[in-house]
Amino acid sequence: MVSQHDTKLLNKDVANNGALDGASLSKNQNTSSTALILEGGSYRGIFTAGVLDVLREKGVTNFESVWGTSAGAINAVSFKSKQIGRAMRIMLAFRDDPRFMSFRSLVTTGNTAGGEFMYEEIQNHLDPCDNEAFNSNPMQMYAVASDVTFGTPAYLHVKSLPNDIKMVQASASMPTVSRMVELDGHRYLDGGTTDSIP
């Protein structure tokens, strides 16, 4: 895990580097201090997914790390695995499927967003993540979740898939409509409640 203080310093370094246009970023990126920060927001994440696809298409991909909260963590998986269109495709293809997100899913699984369907069935079978590409990409990924015991943000280092997919699920487990995700003795919910923009 990374402390909140370290994250704020990283954000300050990124802000001080300037250069927001794509041409400058792709040619002059300094990977020692450049991070991609992705906020959550449920279906607002579809906009982020589109922006990430354009960044990848334009070759703006040389980030040291990607940090995502909730939907941002879900989008980060497809960005790091170099799968253009995957995050948007999933949101559009399954938006009306009651296993993806529905009251029925809440009643039958305890989660409005069907955890098993999203993080196992889609992730491994219906629109699989390229785990090999994810794991071989040197870019580091962090999913921001909320530690329920302490009420503080937790920056979970997603080192490999499929092993660490529960960290992504923890980051996107919305309070009152999702079950808490337990990892290493800690219980987590959606990172948006403690640090929506890491």
Which positions does each model-derived feature cover?
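Patatin-like phospholipase
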Residues: 1-69, 77-198
